[in-house]
Amino acid sequence: MTTNYIFVTGGVVSSLGKGIAAASLAAILEARGLNVTIMKLDPYINVDPGTMSPIQHGEVFVTEDGAETDLDLGHYERFIRTRMTRRNNFTTGRIYSEVLRKERRGDYLGATVQVIPHITNAIKERILAGGEGHDVVLVEIGGTVGDIESLPFLEAIRQMAVEVGREHTMFMHLTLVPYMAAAGEVKTKPTQHSVKELLSIGIQPDVLICRSDRAVPANERAKIALFCNVPEKAVISLKDVDSIYKIPGLLKSQGLDDYICKRFSLNCPEANLSEWEQVIYEEANPVGEVTIGMVGKYIELPDAYKSVIEALKHGGLKNRVTVNIKLIDSQDVETRGEELLKGLDAILIPGGFGYRGVEGKIATARYARENNIPYLGICLGMQVAMIEYARNVAGMENANSTEFVPDCKYPVVALITEWRDENGNVETRSEKSDLGGTMRLGAQQCQLSDDSLVRKLYGEPVITERHRHRYEVNNMLLKPIEAAGLRVAGRSGDDQLVEIIEVPNHPWFVACQFHPEFTSTPRDGHPLFAGFVKAASEYQKRQAK
């Protein structure tokens, strides 16, 4: 089987939506019966985004095999059925570290190690490895054409087009076509200059995706085709839409998938986008709406919680309701109190690190518990729920986590020093371990209690969910907390770690150590988020009586 490669680049400005465009195209090709995957190549020097600030980079998306990756991989998994792995994302930092390790080992036999050929060869090797077994691989190059950081990646894909063959490679370039209100027309010159920059590197784009706030007129697309040396049918208008799930249909309506299949000589049936049409219908025709408060510490950049926000929307789709998300800074809860939490139909506390804002999250968990408001805690959201219950119900005054107060009297949450990874191997950590790549990461099995709410929601006794944490419930202090009424609803596969807790005498209070948002998709949803949004709707109805 021959693998075909589509290299996706961006020009003029950043944040054009290369990831969404690539994922949408992949969704159409998958709907034609092709085996598709997507890769993201990031030009920064960090080995991975694991230690980067969420406010700078956005969320860290965790794959099944425990890789900490770019948030675009979350988009990929929400659009196609293929699960991402550590092969689907790598950075300049990882490439350089591998090449330097080989140099120290003597693998280059005394050669002068250079960007070309050693770095570019390493990039090509990773792309080829990630594409094995697939009909089509979309490779998104992070950054903007013209950035110095992206040059090794662009040179590598230029070489791949020669080595793999132009009949099995395509270059798709996203560019901005701005509308100038004063002139009353869109302007194509930025696109022309962006393509000129790409040509200077030796890359002739085969497809141009023209991003604009409106449809690009046919005469302007013809102009772009003429000056950029691209067939007119390969100049695609991609206007702003109110739902990203409309983009596959928008690309298909302009024949992009037909053009690609013809170019690669792929004989496959027409794309069936009925599942996406159903998603769009459910999104556009809700029968109600709920307001869910999300209390976190990175709310100035919603992308820090991208998968959680999308998962809540998916939960809304499964219940035919619109989910309005109110982002609340946990530090504001500390200073202003409960007034910020009034009027909510449900409360969610997502993951996070560090002491800042933690007391506000603990106060939020208490407010939800005492006022019978549906509550979903994720990762740190479970830990603060445990701390709150220990303090205010189990009588453990000033209970805390050793992450925040290392010498607290009741460390109900503590560092995990030993656990098994996704392959069953024993992992060990200490307070002196590096921060990067040292957490409990990836898919882990969880056993659900027969009498629990989550057992009913999932409908099966054993589930698999993805983790990203280094602190856990301290089993040494668990018995008195359980005696005070808290239910452990899920444990790790080896029965050693607490994975899910519930408050039994509460309408809906669930907190989990894992990250269910990473496996939620618009077509399938997720049991926890569907149940959470349903509970919010029921709470709203009770309040209205």
UniProtKB/Swiss-Prot annotation:
InterPro entries: Class_I_gatase-like, CTP_synthase, CTP_synthase_N, GATASE, GATase1_CTP_Synthase, P-loop_NTPase. Keywords: ATP-binding, Glutamine amidotransferase, Ligase, Magnesium, Metal-binding, Nucleotide-binding, Pyrimidine biosynthesis. Allosterically activated by GTP, when glutamine is the substrate; GTP has no effect on the reaction when ammonia is the substrate. The allosteric effector GTP functions by stabilizing the protein conformation that binds the tetrahedral intermediate(s) formed during glutamine hydrolysis. Inhibited by the product CTP, via allosteric rather than competitive inhibition. Pathway: Pyrimidine metabolism; CTP biosynthesis via de novo pathway; CTP from UDP: step 2/2. L-glutamine binds at residues 352, 380-383, 403, 470. CTP binds at residues 14, 147-149, 187-192, 223. The keyword ATP-binding applies. It comes from the Bacteria. GO terms for cellular component: cytosol. Its EC number is 6.3.4.2. CTPSs have evolved a hybrid strategy for distinguishing between UTP and CTP. The overlapping regions of the product feedback inhibitory and substrate sites recognize a common feature in both compounds, the triphosphate moiety. To differentiate isosteric substrate and product pyrimidine rings, an additional pocket far from the expected kinase/ligase catalytic site, specifically recognizes the cytosine and ribose portions of the product inhibitor. NCBIfam families: PRK05380.1, PyrG. This is CTP synthase. The gene is pyrG.
